[in-house]
């Protein structure tokens, strides 16, 4: 028997659908909150990766909790070592290293899947962080340690291809680095523009979001804000 769907039209549609925030925007915003003062993110979806991000924030010493549909994050990170098992479960966990480097000068995490450094697509992240003064090594199988002995500084960085994750990592690192960072070959996805808008709301200075070249003037201290992340365009479609 043929499987088919028959849609009978002729009736006007009405009503409204609430679109949750996009997970791919929320995760870097949660990482960015470690750089800022008190942050409230509106209408955050209750997903497993969001719960893992909460655990990473708490593991770093930040206060993070739900208030209804909103996520509240406050307090600067105190611990440079991210919970290993949680970090392994989420590919975006590498994003949380950049704020730790910027604030504490050190970040330690398990790589997603517990793989060796060369086995995961984070080479663009690491190459850019090196240009900003970071040094990395493996403390054991799948365990990555990053340090910035003299602090992170601005740099001119060109990505080999427009990686969204690497662009987010380097924007996070540059937002509180010393000096100005110019990032060429950057990803142009809406989530990048959303991250820049959030950081600028928190008194960062980022220009060019949405284009392939970003200019980021580092600010040592960022304020907090209330922010509504980008709606999930996949859900909306």
What is the meaning of each model-derived region?
Residues 1-237:
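Structural preference for solvent-exposed beta-strand-turn elements
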